[in-house]
Amino acid sequence: MAALALSEAMVNDRRKAFEALKAELSAKASLPSLPIEGTIATAIPELDRLLAGGFPSGSVATLEGATGRWSIAAGLVSAMTRRSLVAILDDGALYPPGLADAGACLERVLIVPVRKALEVARAADIILRSRICRLILMPAIALRDSIWARLATLAHRNGVLLIVMATRAGAALSAVAELRLHCALERIIMRGTHGLWGGFAGFQLRVNLRKHKHILPGRQARVRALSSLSAMSS
């Protein structure tokens, strides 16, 4: 009987300790994030606040979702071309005028046409090793775990931000990605009168944080992507 009572007491003590630890972690999760060293700002205030400064340099990150991921990428490319070269491995999804509308300096954008998975992997490997660009964008493709791991190692070693554009990241990519963001269309923004006489002004995105090395997932930000015509008329 004494042994049974002692065992129950130990279980109760462990349960109390667990509840106390859970409460402490929950309290820490509600605190504002501190700025993280070695980040690359996106020039989108709402997104930079979500990421405590921006994308982590020297890492693999994903921009996911059916809508809006290229709007986020365009803002980042615009900010980066002010001080560095940017490489984009293009499988046909890129629309260069959209980059220009976002303010990117196209003379500092290296566009590499790619079609096959092997071409994408080789191009990413070569540019990462060359260290000529601080930012590389590439399409999501099916690669072996070892290849994703090698690309992640090269990005980390050379201080390059490698962003993978994906509708949804697969298991191998998710494993090596230090940051994962998912973009979703929240609403269309109209200019002027609604209906026949209204005009498209842009859209509002909801950006969800799915993975981050230093920040708990689940946080989100709302970002407005305005068309160039709307910006000119405002």
Task: Please identify what each model-predicted range represents.
Residues 83, 105-107, 132-133, 158-161, ...:
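Short glycine-/polar-rich loops that comprise or flank the Walker A/P-loop
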Residues 164-234:
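Phosphate-binding/switch region of NTP-binding enzymes
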Residues 83-146:
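Conserved inter-motif catalytic segment of the P-loop NTP-binding fold
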Residues 47, 63, 109, 136, ...:
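Conserved RecA-like P-loop NTPase ATPase core
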